[in-house]
Amino acid sequence: MSAAMPNTAPETPETPGAPDVPALQVEDLTVRFAGLTALDSVSFTVRPGTVHALIGPNGAGKSTCFNVLSGVYRATSGHVRFGERELTGMPPHRIADLGVARIFQNLALPPLATVEDSLLLGRHRLTRTGFVSAGLRLPSAAREERTHRERVREIAEFVGISAYLDRPAGSLAYGQQKLAELARALCMEPRLLLLDEPVAGMTADERRRTAAVIAGVRDSLGISIVLVEHDMGVVMRLADAVTVLDFGRRIADGAPADVQNDPAVVRAYLGERPDEPRGEETAS
């Protein structure tokens, strides 16, 4: 995986997933907190090797949905399935072991560690050498570390940050640190990426570069991506499918162009509400 970072994001082609990447199925997902309904019977399917955007106004339930997908929250009812595996109620570390990686909105790189060492942390679940062997620097441990570092360098080149591997992560510009976060997630060798506002706070150039990398992850690696993002330009360029939430309910689902013109979506973003009862507002 040593391809150079693409300059522009492709226009959402149909891309088959890698053979071992299953579909993610969310079925009738409901989450309640002390009587407040954060998600109300939400369903959608992420096809293998596609970018599926989850959008909606603030308070729509997007972050709650992400927290259920990654195991941080437990659903009140409903199911999340990754292929044949039931993720509902599974703890975060077990979900990660199935190849699900999440990137949070806030930066989480160790600021004083080098970028290379920060990325190496993403290889932790793939490490077979025990603490004793690593501490004694046995030949098997040294060989495994070399293999992991080679992989880290390949991924850094793919993402476009190989020039910064020897620098402290905290010294990088904000956009570069966000790319390093993405590279660290890729170091886990995921089959599904959960990206929570990956271009938030970036300059226009940084947004374009990051969108190009995300497109490359889908097109070159066949990894499925669930994307929460407020930048509708990025969503429309990247997403193969879009699910729209509003007050915890799914109000639209389909191709980006169709969803963009859906009257219910337009009303939600303009602040106009239909007359039927709605669920309670919670954190987005």
Model regions: which residues?
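Glycine-rich phosphate-binding loops of nucleotide-dependent enzymes
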Residues: 2-284
